[in-house]
Amino acid sequence: MKKLRVLVAEDHAAVRSSVVRLLSKNYDVVGTVNDGRALLEAVHTSEPDVLVVDLSLPVITGIEAASILKKMDCPSKIVFLTVHNDADFVRAAHDAGALGYVLKQQMTTDLPEAIDKAFAGEQFTSPSVRDV
């Protein structure tokens, strides 16, 4: 079975490395970027199945990048990876077209499930997110 192609957008190098290490076993990590503009460019060159995106990227935020990709009918599914444990952020993420919302502190348990569900067209939010 073909591994899902995942692109990681995270501006903190240590977190980016941890995400790649976590995902490399079961997914084809086709690239990493550290800002929203680079994410928009990389989507077209790497054609990922799923994007794992930090909500607070520099240059263009993750929310803004997701909104742009949604308007462009980008086929890649989006999973946000964030420290923001707040219902308003979750709503903004879903409004921008994301199917997944994973807290960084739950990454090892929640991110693989969120990626798989997003690829299947299903929503996933870390269970510990408040008031959703």
Model-derived regions, located:
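Conserved active-site segment of CheY-like receiver
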Residues: 11, 81-85, 104-106
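Two-component/phosphorelay signaling modules centered on CheY-like receiver
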Residues: 12-31
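Residue-level signal for the "D+5" position in two-component response regulator receiver
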Residues: 32, 57-60
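Acidic, metal-coordinating helix/loop segments flanking the phosphotransfer/catalytic sites
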Residues: 32-50
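Acidic catalytic/metal-coordinating carboxylates
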Residues: 35, 61-64
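The feature encodes the CheY-like receiver
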Residues: 53, 58, 82
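Short amphipathic alpha-helix used as the core "switch/output" element in two-component signaling
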Residues: 63-75
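Short, flexible helix-to-coil linker/hinge segments that flank and couple to helix-turn-helix
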Residues: 90-95, 100-132
